[in-house]
């Protein structure tokens, strides 16, 4: 992840943390200058899924209307200067709250933002190594995926990036194509017999035919990290806690913000969608998390430290390849410049436990 991106994310967190205080100060200033009470403020900006929102007003409020993300939300006034709002959604991340009504007979409308963290404490996934195979130690793995029983790999580094078709039992490349040296290859996925390959900082996604001839290129406006898909929806990570959704023509259709019970989970890298969940490795770690693909909640995690081969640079040559073989119901895992690929059975029944209510 770039330093600029880290600074941007940090600024967003600070903005959210102090939002309620800024809103209150703004309300007091307008009231002082105009003699009118203009609006509302959240008593805090971060909640846990299942919590109710607490809104404070500077005076008596009537005709209150509340919407969350454009949909009407049930609420109840507490006295004349505060209200409780039910959050009926089950999705983590930042949400928009629109409040309108009358305060001291003066109409007002405010738009506020709040953050929802997961109500799940992630469980611990267990894994069993079934076997291992050779893997090209020259491959700086960035993406790994099975398609119709055949294994494909995307690799990175400028001047070394490739798309490959791999014999998993021998580790040899059956077919390959090189990216131009200006491109640092990243994650791959295959939809409708088209191979998509991201680039890191170039903002370009290549789409290939199955014979590795170039079909089309697309552009995006942030870093490209991991890539997977559900049906015809592409799912892309950018190194933050966000997963972006696109259709097969790379038109944005939505996104998902990934959270555990403590807050956003960043450095999401390589992705693999399996049966309603996204498996993702956390950059510069040996950790794999399982994400609910609808809500954004991290429901389980596991540490693969015991699988890292000896004599690799543990800081540079990190875990970074996750492929699921649907007929075997097994995962194939490897890393950047690893000499081995592992066939692994993961306990996929772990779903975590509910956060205890205070």
Where are these regions (language model features)?
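Beta-rich, blade/repeat-based domains predominating
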Residues: 137-148, 181-191, 220-232, 263-276, ...
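Short loop/turn segments that connect beta-strands within beta-propeller blades
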Residues: 166-171, 209-213, 247-251, 292-296, ...
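Surface-exposed, short loops/turns at beta-strand junctions within beta-sandwich domains
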Residues: 87-94
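Bacterial signal peptide processing site
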Residues: 21-25
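Short proline/glycine-enriched turn/loop motifs at strand-loop junctions of beta-rich domains
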Residues: 57-63, 200
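Conserved beta-strand positions in repeat-built beta-propeller and related beta-rich domains
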Residues: 153-158, 197-202, 236-241, 280-284, ...
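A short beta-strand motif characteristic of beta-propeller blades
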Residues: 128-134, 172-178, 212-218, 254-263, ...
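A short helix->beta-strand "capping" segment at the edge of beta-propeller domains
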Residues: 117-138, 168-174
């Amino acid at each position: 992840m770039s330093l600029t991106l880290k600074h941007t994310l940090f600024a967003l967190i600070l903005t959210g943390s102090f939002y309620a205080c800024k809103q209150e100060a703004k309300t007091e200033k307008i009231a002082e200058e105009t003699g009118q009470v203009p609006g509302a403020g959240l008593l805090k900006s971060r909640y846990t899924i299942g919590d109710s929102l607490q809104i404070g007003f500077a005076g008596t409020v009537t005709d209150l209307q509340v919407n969350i993300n454009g949909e009407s939300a049930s609420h109840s006034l507490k006295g004349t200067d505060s209200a409780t709002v039910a959050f009926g959604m089950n999705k983590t991340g930042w949400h928009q709250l629109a409040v309108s009504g009358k305060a001291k007979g003066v109409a007002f409308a405010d738009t506020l933002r709040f953050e929802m963290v997961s109500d799940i404490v992630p469980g611990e996934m267990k894994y069993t190594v079934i076997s291992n195979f050779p893997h090209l130690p020259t491959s700086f793995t960035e993406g790994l995926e099975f398609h119709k029983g055949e294994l494909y790999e995307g690799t990175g580094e400028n001047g070394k990036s490739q798309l490959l078709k791999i014999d998993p039992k021998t580790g040899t490349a059956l077919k390959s194509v090189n990216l131009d040296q200006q491109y640092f290859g990243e994650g791959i996925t295959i939809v409708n017999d088209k191979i998509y390959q991201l680039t890191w900082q170039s903002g370009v996604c290549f789409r290939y035919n199955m014979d590795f001839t170039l079909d089309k290129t697309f552009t995006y406006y942030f870093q490209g990290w991991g890539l997977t898909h559900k049906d015809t929806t592409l799912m892309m990570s950018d190194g933050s806690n966000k997963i972006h959704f696109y259709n097969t023509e790379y038109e944005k259709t939505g996104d998902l913000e990934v959270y555990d019970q403590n807050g956003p989970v960043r450095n999401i890298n390589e992705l693999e969608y399996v049966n309603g969940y996204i498996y993702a490795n956390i950059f510069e770690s040996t950790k794999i998390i399982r994400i609910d693909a609808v809500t954004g909640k991290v429901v389980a995690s596991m540490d693969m430290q015991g699988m890292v081969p000896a004599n690799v640079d543990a800081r540079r040559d990190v875990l970074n390849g996750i492929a699921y073989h649907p007929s075997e119901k097994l995962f194939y895992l490897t890393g950047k410049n690893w000499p081995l690929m592992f066939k692994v059975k993961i306990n996929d029944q772990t779903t975590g436990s509910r956060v205890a209510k205070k």
